[in-house]
């Protein structure tokens, strides 16, 4: 059975402040706990507490939940990937989680710049547990800019501007072995002052833009054909 102290701690993990204080995340579901692996600190089911539904964040409760330490990836883990995603100000947890899931599917690394807390339970769920597998790091803008000065990475900005080149299935033929995609939010676009070649995804004009995670999926699929 969970103690009152344990329940209080688990409940606190639903907030950014609580996660930061405890250095723990709330992980909901057996598959995600499996992917968290040795990072898991505690697991519990409805038989361990009468307050199970209050301790989790999903409307449809999983059979098991738990707490886990955030993964600790190194910059070398990200640089080792042929494709790196620089995510700029992605604030929707569902979008961030989906992009992390895509990074796992298409073997990419991620740098998070001013994004929503990756420990948000919705990020973890939307990532399908890939938050514990696909390498990522949070960086501030000065650190990103300093890092870019030390690496020779062609930069491609996913954005619809007048000077942007259409992204097509043949784009991968011109891409070198290692590249960096810069991706901004659907509402604000790319706000980080990171120079690069602009690429846009063609679509029907009756909509202004496509969902950012959808755009990343298209770009990564094309990239994966040559990476």
Labelled PLM ranges:
Residues 1-45, 115-119:
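Boundary-proximal intrinsically disordered activation/regulatory segments immediately upstream
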Residues 20-24, 40-42, 108-110, 133-134, ...:
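Short active-site oxyanion
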Residues 29, 91-98, 210-215:
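Amphipathic alpha-helical repeat scaffolds
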Residues 46-49, 67, 113, 139, ...:
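Generic beta-sheet signal
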Residues 49-73:
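Glycine/small-residue-rich loop that forms an oxyanion/phosphate-binding "nest" at active or ligand-binding sites
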Residues 66, 102-105, 120-132, 191-227:
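Structured adenosyl-cofactor binding patch, chiefly the S-adenosyl-L-methionine
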Residues 78-162:
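RNA substrate-binding interface of SAM-dependent RNA methyltransferases
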């Amino acid at each position: 059975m969970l103690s009152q102290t344990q329940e209080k701690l688990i409940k606190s993990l639903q907030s950014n402040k609580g996660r930061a204080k405890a250095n723990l995340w709330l992980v909901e579901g057996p598959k995600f706990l499996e992917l968290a692996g040795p990072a898991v600190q505690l697991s519990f089911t409805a038989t361990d507490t009468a307050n199970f539904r209050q301790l989790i964040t999903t409307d449809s409760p999983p059979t098991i939940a738990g707490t886990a330490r955030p993964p600790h990836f190194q910059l070398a883990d990200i640089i080792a990937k042929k494709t790196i995603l620089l995510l700029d100000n992605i604030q929707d947890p569902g979008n961030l989680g989906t992009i992390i899931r895509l990074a796992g599917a298409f073997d990419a690394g991620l740098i998070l710049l001013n994004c929503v807390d990756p420990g948000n339970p919705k990020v973890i769920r939307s990532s399908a547990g890939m938050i514990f597998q696909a390498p990522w790091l949070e960086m501030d803008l000065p650190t990103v800019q300093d890092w870019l000065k030390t690496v020779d990475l062609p930069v491609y900005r996913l954005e619809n501007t007048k000077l942007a080149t259409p992204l097509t299935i043949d784009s991968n033929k011109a891409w070198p072995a290692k590249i960096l995609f810069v991706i901004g939010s659907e509402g604000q676009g790319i706000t980080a002052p990171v120079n690069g070649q602009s690429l846009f995804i063609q679509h029907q004009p009756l909509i202004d833009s496509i969902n950012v995670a959808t755009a990343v999926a298209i770009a990564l699929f094309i990239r994966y054909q040559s990476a």
